[in-house]
């Protein structure tokens, strides 16, 4: 059984890593980022729900009189 030649693995892994790094740097550098990020104000809108204005009583089974 022939032995696996691993002498070129270091060069292959190193060149692949460098190539991926360069490609990612190019991809990031070509991306358009906003120049001045600003804070967006969040306005909460109060909605009038019909059940908020009414008083409701919830009867739990334990508070009912015994029969």
Curated annotation (Swiss-Prot):
Q: Which InterPro entries match?
A: ATP8_mammal, ATP8_metazoa
Q: Name one GO biological process term.
A: proton motive force-driven ATP synthesis
Question: Where is the protein situated, by its record's location annotation?
Answer: Mitochondrion membrane
User: Care to name a GO molecular-function term for this sequence?
Assistant: proton transmembrane transporter activity
PANTHER family according to UniProt: ATP SYNTHASE PROTEIN 8
PTM annotation (N6-acetyllysine): residues: 54, 57
Where does the record place the modification N6-succinyllysine? 54
Q: What is this protein called?
A: ATP synthase protein 8
Membrane as a keyword? yes
Coiled-coil portions = none
State the function annotated in the UniProt record: Mitochondrial membrane ATP synthase (F(1)F(0) ATP synthase or Complex V) produces ATP from ADP in the presence of a proton gradient across the membrane which is generated by electron transport complexes of the respiratory chain. F-type ATPases consist of two structural domains, F(1) - containing the extramembraneous catalytic core and F(0) - containing the membrane proton channel, linked together by a central stalk and a peripheral stalk. During catalysis, ATP synthesis in the catalytic domain of F(1) is coupled via a rotary mechanism of the central stalk subunits to proton translocation.
Organism (species) = Microtus pennsylvanicus (Meadow vole)
The portions of this protein that span the membrane are: 8-24
What is its membrane topology?
Answer: Single-pass membrane protein
- Give the signal sequence positions: none
Any Gene Ontology CC annotation: proton-transporting ATP synthase complex
Q: Oligomeric state and partners?
A: F-type ATPases have 2 components, CF(1) - the catalytic core - and CF(0) - the membrane proton channel. Component of an ATP synthase complex composed of ATP5PB, ATP5MC1, ATP5F1E, ATP5PD, ATP5ME, ATP5PF, ATP5MF, MT-ATP6, MT-ATP8, ATP5F1A, ATP5F1B, ATP5F1D, ATP5F1C, ATP5PO, ATP5MG, ATP5MK and ATP5MJ. Interacts with PRICKLE3.
Q: Which family does it belong to?
A: Belongs to the ATPase protein 8 family.
Key words of the record: Acetylation, ATP synthesis, CF(0), Hydrogen ion transport, Ion transport, Membrane, Mitochondrion, Transmembrane, Transmembrane helix, Transport
Read off the Pfam families from this record: ATP-synt_8
What gene codes for this chain? MT-ATP8
Q: Which cysteines are joined by disulfide bonds?
A: none
The root-end lineage is: Eukaryota, Metazoa, Chordata, Craniata, Vertebrata
